[in-house]
Amino acid sequence: MENLFAKKVPLYFETEESQLVLGDSFKILTKMEPESVDMIFADPPYFLSNDGITCQGGKMVSVNKGSWDKLSESGTSVEEKHKFNRKWIKLCKKVLKPNGTIWISGTLHNIYSIGMALEQEGFKIINNITWQKTNPPPNLACRCFTHSTETILWAKKNDKKSRHFFDYQKMKEMNGGKQMKDVWTG
């Protein structure tokens, strides 16, 4: 596979059909050739780092992930979060081929800003997939429902000429002869 980067970037993993890069997306996306990518899967910061607690492996642990999960020391405002999302989504659009798609995972903490940013940056959301976790962490605060799902937004460039690929028959085959639904468990 030809290297998709205008400037050399070390690859984390590579096969004949794909290249995986690990690093700061703002730096990496600016080094990529325009319209060179068929599909992007993004798992951006959820902005959960708020000095709270969660359960991991049966133990209470901090939800603070690191500085990358916070935009400022005073926390992350809605405006900061949305500006951040628009910035990286705009860079993704530049490198995505005309028929390419982007998949973005998130939780209620960030996914609504991401959906709006996608539309503002000229994307059309194809599907809103709900991933139901089989073993979510318990709700330690006991003040709301247990967070047991994540959302995956699947989108394409909002252009009348844009034609994304979807192998309907393969999905049906993988799902016991039935249409694949937008709620996944795992």
Model-derived regions, located:
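Core catalytic lobe of class I
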Residues: 1-186
